[in-house]
A protein has these predicted regions:
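Accessory alpha-helical/coil subdomains and C-terminal extensions
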Residues: 7, 12, 39-43, 158-232
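Short acidic, glycine-rich surface-loop motifs adjacent to enzyme active sites
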Residues: 79-93, 229-241
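Short Gly/Thr/Asp-enriched flexible loops that form oxyanion-binding sites at enzyme active sites
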Residues: 86-108, 246-253
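Short, ordered loop/turn segments at secondary-structure junctions
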Residues: 14-16, 56, 89-91, 115-118, ...
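Internal gly/pro-rich beta-alpha loop/helix module
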Residues: 112-183
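ATP/nucleoside-binding phosphotransfer catalytic cores, i.e., glycine-rich phosphate-binding loops
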Residues: 246-328
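ATP/NTP phosphate-donor binding region
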Residues: 1-76, 233, 250, 261, ...
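Short, acidic/small-residue loops that bind anionic groups at enzyme active sites
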Residues: 97-127, 138, 257-266
């Protein structure tokens, strides 16, 4: 709902470095969402902000229940606010953004932001990220989908990855490119802002899905252990276009035979999985076994898609979740 007056923004705060202060045992998120908004005068001068504090933790400590609560709060807030902004730790921000892109309504948009430096740092990046996120969330062109705004750049949730552990320019969108960039004259759009993800029903995340990595000399025991624990699905983070060691291939075949859904992704940052290589462990052989290739999604986002699909009240076509996105 776009207001002709001061735009309204609902902020969903979850903790993270943007709320962090230095202590004897390191940085911890101690500042509330209200405190963070009040510390940036440009926000109160231009926006009517309200806040819901969903969590107060590092993003690595968030649970699947937390991200469901974030999604539910986004949906409620979007009914009355001109924009919705989620304050989130950077380590898992891309995962939450992609989950929101999958489950929030088709007429809802949400912008996630945070910081690499604490609020008490001599040169904090949080205030500028907040201002930019508010501007993006209330922009008339940004009407659907989930985004990450960071370091003057707006990224689509499906594309964005954290590529630097500490630099304020932490995120990029790889071969997809930016959605927009903040300039002195406002947001400059490089392509239409839209969701690039399939739509899944929002529900409690009751399924169990794990990520198993592969490497030289690592066999399939990690996957077998996951199956023995009763998981519903496994994402195998493979090499190249989706190739795994022979013993991992054996474990995949066993898992599929026991009803576990297996998605194979690539640890490469660009490109996509493809059923090119045969032989025992090649992606073509894995597809013949019944594995699903994850396309260009990384393992963590593929897990979010599989988790949401397997938790849905109705059957979902798993393979279609990993089709290439179609731009309108």
């Amino acid at each position: 709902m776009k207001s002709p007056h001061m735009p309204s923004v609902h902020v969903i705060a979850t903790g993270g470095t943007i709320a962090g202060t230095d202590g004897e045992r390191g940085v911890s998120p101690s500042r509330s969402g209200h405190e963070l908004i009040e510390a940036v005068p440009q926000l109160s001068d231009r926006f009517d902000a309200t806040v819901t504090q969903v969590a107060q933790r590092p993003s690595t400590a968030l649970s699947t229940s937390d991200i469901v609560a974030i999604a539910e709060t986004v949906e409620r807030a979007a009914a009355t606010a001109d924009g919705v902004v989620v304050l989130h730790g950077t380590d898992t921000m891309a995962e939450t953004a992609y989950y929101l892109d999958l489950v929030v309504g088709s007429d809802t948009s949400v912008v996630l932001t945070g910081s690499q430096r604490t609020a008490t740092d001599p040169s904090p990046d949080g205030p500028a990220n907040l201002v930019g996120a508010f501007e993006a969330a209330t922009h008339a062109t940004v009407e659907t989908g989930a985004y990450v705004f960071f370091n003057d750049r707006l990224h689509a949730a499906r594309a964005v990855r954290k590529r630097h552990a500490s630099n304020p320019g932490a995120y990029d969108s790889g071969h997809y490119g930016l959605v927009a960039e903040r300039t002195p004259e406002g947001l400059w759009f490089y392509r239409r802002p839209e969701s690039l993800s399939p739509r899944l029903p929002q529900s409690e995340l009751t399924a169990s899905v794990e990520v198993v990595t592969t490497s030289i000399g690592i066999g399939g025991d990690g996957l077998r252990d996951a199956v023995d624990r009763g998981v519903d699905g496994v994402v195998v983070d493979a090499s190249g276009m989706g190739n795994v060691p022979p013993d991992v291939a054996d474990a995949i075949e066993t898992a599929i035979g026991e009803g576990v859904r297996v998605v194979v992704t690539s640890r490469c940052t660009d490109g996509a999985t493809a059923p090119v290589y045969g032989g025992h462990g090649g992606a073509a052989a894995l597809v013949e076994m019944g594995a699903v290739l994850g396309g260009d999604l990384d393992a963590h986002k593929a897990r979010m898609a599989l988790l949401a699909a397997l938790s849905a009240p109705a059957d979902i076509d798993i393979e279609s979740l990993f089709d290439p996105p179609l731009f309108e």
